[in-house]
UniProtKB/Swiss-Prot annotation:
Keywords: ATP synthesis, CF(0), Hydrogen ion transport, Ion transport, Membrane, Thylakoid, Transmembrane, Transmembrane helix, Transport. One of its GO terms (cellular component) is plasma membrane-derived thylakoid membrane. GO terms for molecular function: proton-transporting ATP synthase activity, rotational mechanism; proton-transporting ATPase activity, rotational mechanism. It is found in: Cellular thylakoid membrane. The chain crosses the membrane at residues 23-40. It comes from the Bacteria. F(1)F(0) ATP synthase produces ATP from ADP in the presence of a proton or sodium gradient. F-type ATPases consist of two structural domains, F(1) containing the extramembraneous catalytic core and F(0) containing the membrane proton channel, linked together by a central stalk and a peripheral stalk. During catalysis, ATP synthesis in the catalytic domain of F(1) is coupled via a rotary mechanism of the central stalk subunits to proton translocation. Component of the F(0) channel, it forms part of the peripheral stalk, linking F(1) to F(0). The b'-subunit is a diverged and duplicated form of b found in plants and photosynthetic bacteria. This is ATP synthase subunit b'. CDD domains: ATP-synt_Fo_b. It comes from Prochlorococcus marinus subsp. pastoris (strain CCMP1986 / NIES-2087 / MED4). F-type ATPases have 2 components, F(1) - the catalytic core - and F(0) - the membrane proton channel. F(1) has five subunits: alpha(3), beta(3), gamma(1), delta(1), epsilon(1). F(0) has four main subunits: a(1), b(1), b'(1) and c(10-14). The alpha and beta chains form an alternating ring which encloses part of the gamma chain. F(1) is attached to F(0) by a central stalk formed by the gamma and epsilon chains, while a peripheral stalk is formed by the delta, b and b' chains.
């Protein structure tokens, strides 16, 4: 037959109130302490170190990213400045070459005009000289004709 005790459980059941219960409680506390000191603390320390490592790496990455962005902005600024300076130099060189071209063209035109004027004056002198010779020859010829006509009479 089954005998029931005051709490409704049979003897030798799952929960007997005797020395086993405090012993089990002491074992649970001891096991918790041992697991905590041998397993959970080292694992917790490793996890904390890993979190610190990851956190530090993230902070370093953010700092490096901001530094890279700053350097990129500086380099872009320098690039724009260099492009502006290059355009300015090219523009100045074009202006200088245009100026030199115009000066050379003006000098060539002046030389051409001077040569043309010199040639015109030389042609006028030669024409005048040729005209004078023709007039002199015409005078000589007319004098010769007049002298022959006078001699024939």
């Amino acid at each position: 037959m089954l005998a029931f005790d005051f709490f409704g459980a049979t003897e030798g059941g799952l929960f007997d109130i005797n020395a086993t219960l405090p012993l089990m409680a002491i074992q649970v506390v001891a096991l918790t302490y041992i697991l905590n000191s041998l397993f959970f603390k080292p694992v917790g320390n490793v996890v904390e170190k890993r979190e610190k490592f990851v956190s530090n790496n993230i902070m370093d990455a953010k700092n490096k990213l901001s530094e890279v962005e700053k350097l990129e902005a500086d380099l872009l600024s320098q690039l724009q400045s260099a492009r502006y300076e290059a355009q300015k130099i090219v523009s100045e060189a074009e202006n200088e070459s245009d100026k030199l071209y115009k000066e050379a063209l003006a000098l060539a035109n002046d030389e051409a005009n001077a040569s043309k004027e010199k040639a015109r004056l030389e042609i006028e002198n030669q024409t005048s000289s040729a005209r004078d010779q023709l007039f002199k020859q015409a005078d000589d010829l007319s004098e010769l004709i007049v002298n022959r006509l006078i001699l024939e009479k």
